[in-house]
Amino acid sequence: MATINQLVRKPRVKKVVKSNVPALESCPQKRGVCTRVYTTTPKKPNSALRKVCRIRLTNGFEVTSYIGGEGHNLQEHSVVLIRGGRVKDLPGVRYHTVRGALDCAGVKDRKQSRSKYGVKRPKA
């Protein structure tokens, strides 16, 4: 326990919490325009072609965002919504595109976990 004199000389310092998703600026989602849509390979034990896109956000940030689900309709100049959430095996990818919002279509023929992929309830 510090004495009062010690606290007068050097007050207690608040810990600064650093955001994992700085480009969102404390917003739940942000809108942006795709500048490049491409595939990339994951880190060591995994192997795949992960679909990602480079996005210029409305606040001027340029970020890389993962496109989840099977198949997508994104190309350059598509307007997309991004949310936070990193992809563990893709270094530098800290955001996800929101499927079924703005220009990003939902996943075709998706039956389970539909809300995460922007798919409406199937008819009967």
Swiss-Prot record:
CC per GO annotation: small ribosomal subunit
BP GO terms, sorted: translation
Keywords (A to Z) from UniProt: Methylation, Ribonucleoprotein, Ribosomal protein, RNA-binding, rRNA-binding, tRNA-binding
Chain positions with 3-methylthioaspartic acid modification: 89
Keyword GTP-binding: no
GO MF assignments: rRNA binding; structural constituent of ribosome; tRNA binding
Pfam family, one: Ribosom_S12_S23
Oligomer status and interactors: Part of the 30S ribosomal subunit. Contacts proteins S8 and S17. May interact with IF1 in the 30S initiation complex.
Entry function: With S4 and S5 plays an important role in translational accuracy. Interacts with and stabilizes bases of the 16S rRNA that are involved in tRNA selection in the A site and with the mRNA backbone. Located at the interface of the 30S and 50S subunits, it traverses the body of the 30S subunit contacting proteins on the other side and probably holding the rRNA structure together. The combined cluster of proteins S8, S12 and S17 appears to hold together the shoulder and platform of the 30S subunit.
PANTHER family recorded: 30S RIBOSOMAL PROTEIN S12 FAMILY MEMBER
Similarity comment: Belongs to the universal ribosomal protein uS12 family.
Protein name per Swiss-Prot or TrEMBL: Small ribosomal subunit protein uS12
Organism: Histophilus somni (strain 2336)
Gene responsible for this protein: rpsL
